Each structure stands twice: as structure tokens, then as C-alpha cells.
């Protein structure tokens, strides 16, 4: 089941690394990410997208079947999602996932409706479903289903002004399995 829009995004701690449960909550309560995938040549490709979390820990991304994201995932299922906090101080969380392309029409429309709600900040009504279904068919939309297996956190470390430089702290984060328990 698709999770509803979170009333309030999780705020990452600024004095320590995020716990595994906090990393999962960060992902579940935010809405945008940089979707990364391998290209045949050159460096990795990245796209800023809205994503929709599910109650069984998948992250769903809507795209067109002919776009690079879908083509690349069909070739190589390893992807990354750099989940972005849209508030100050900016935080991000890298999520590593295995992905598959799903073209089930009902899921495609559900995800497109959910993305529309995340973009506007309010869920779209059922009256939008026929329009979205027609658009999904015309654009040959698919869903990329991402199953996270690991995360890497980057703590927020920003200055509001230069006299805060002495208070700025740094620490080393690390990769943590997606389903890791809290210590």
C-alpha cells in the first residue's frame, strides 16, 4: 500500500549520526530524491524525482517506458536514491536499492496520483483518476519499484553566519543495512 503524504518530514539530528530507524523514517516522510543509475558509457546518470514510499518499504518512481531510467533499470537493477530534505539545514540520505520496472496500469495510475499529491502538498481526488489514467497510457508510463538494501547518511552541517564556524562539528557516517536494528 502506498503511504500517505507525511504531515511533517522527519528532522535529522544535528549532533549525531541517524539511527537505522531514523534513516527509514527520514525516507518515508520526505518526497524528493536524486535518482541515480548506471549508464552504458560515461558517468552515472541522475534525475531529480518525486518518489512514493510503500508500507512494505519499497520506494516507487514514475517514469516513461522510453526514458533512460526505465531502460537502465531493465539492463542493471542497481540504483541509488539520494533523498533530499527540502528544509534548512539541508540533509540528505543515500539509499542503495535493487529496482524493477512494473507496467501494471493500476499501480502506474496510483503512483502518478500520489506523486501529484506530493507535488501539490494535497492528495488528488478520485475525479483526477480518469485524466491521469489517460495521460499514463498516452505517455507509456511505468513504475520503478526500488527495494532498499542499504543507506548512507550525511548529517546537516551548515553555517548561518561565519561566527558559527567554531561550533561546526564533523563525524564519519557509514553504510547501514536498510533493515538494521537500532543499537
Tell where the protein language model's regions lie, with residue ranges.
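Short, surface-exposed beta-strand-loop junctions and turns on beta-sheet-rich folds
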Residues: 67-69, 88, 160-161
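Short beta-strand segments
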Residues: 30-65, 73, 79-84, 92-95
Amino acid at each position: 500500500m502506498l503511504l500517505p503524504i507525511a504531515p511533517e518530514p522527519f528532522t535529522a539530528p544535528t549532533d549525531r549520526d541517524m539511527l537505522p530507524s531514523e534513516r527509514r523514517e527520514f525516507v518515508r516522510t520526505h518526497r524528493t530524491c536524486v535518482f541515480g543509475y548506471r549508464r552504458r558509457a560515461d558517468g552515472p546518470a541522475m534525475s531529480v524525482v518525486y518518489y512514493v514510499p510503500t508500507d512494505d518499504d519499497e520506494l516507487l518512481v514514475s517514469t516513461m517506458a522510453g526514458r533512460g531510467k526505465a531502460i537502465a533499470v531493465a539492463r542493471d537493477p542497481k540504483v541509488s536514491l539520494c533523498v533530499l530534505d527540502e528544509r534548512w539545514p539541508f540533509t540528505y540520505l543515500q539509499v542503495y536499492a535493487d529496482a524493477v520496472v512494473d507496467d501494471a496500469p493500476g499501480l502506474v495510475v496510483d503512483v502518478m496520483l500520489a506523486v501529484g499529491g506530493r507535488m501539490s502538498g494535497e492528495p488528488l481526488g478520485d475525479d483526477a483518476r480518469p485524466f491521469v489514467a489517460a495521460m499514463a497510457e498516452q505517455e507509456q508510463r511505468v513504475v520503478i519499484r526500488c527495494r532498499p538494501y542499504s543507506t548512507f547518511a550525511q548529517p546537516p552541517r551548515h553555517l548561518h553566519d561565519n561566527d558559527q564556524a567554531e561550533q561546526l562539528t564533523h563525524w564519519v557516517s557509514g553504510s547501514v543495512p536498510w533493515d538494521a536494528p537500532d543499537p
